[in-house]
Amino acid sequence: MKSIILIAPPAAGKGTQSSLIEKTYHIPHISTSDLIRKMISENNEKYGELQKSLDNGILISDDIILELLKIRLSNKDCSNGYILDGFPRNINQAYCYEEILKELNLNESIVIYLSLDKTIAEKRVLGRMVCPNCKSVYNKYFIETSPK
């Protein structure tokens, strides 16, 4: 199984599609945002400044993102494929990702771009809500995703 990279604007459904692919093909869904949150939650000394950067609206450096990704991709569960959500975000990350693939002896990835009209994207972002009890994400503007 090849690995899959999902690229799309915010609220286009990367997470939703990744979850469906993950369940169907039994490959892990890797989100760079989740990797960062995990490091912050573990109070890892090496990544102690991450929360401050995020709080100040500063993008996390490519070096840190690539280091976290390389660590995650070296796990055994990625050897048969994985889904990358929200990565790469720039050309440098794409080139470095190719090097990581070679270094870890992983297959090349299939890239899927999810298109979304800007008006719909804005409506999805503004209507996005998280259930405080079950943590399910839904949208108050779209009936198919509203809570039952």
Q: What positions do the PLM features span?
A:
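Glycine-rich phosphate-binding loop of ATP-dependent small-molecule kinases
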Residues: 1-148
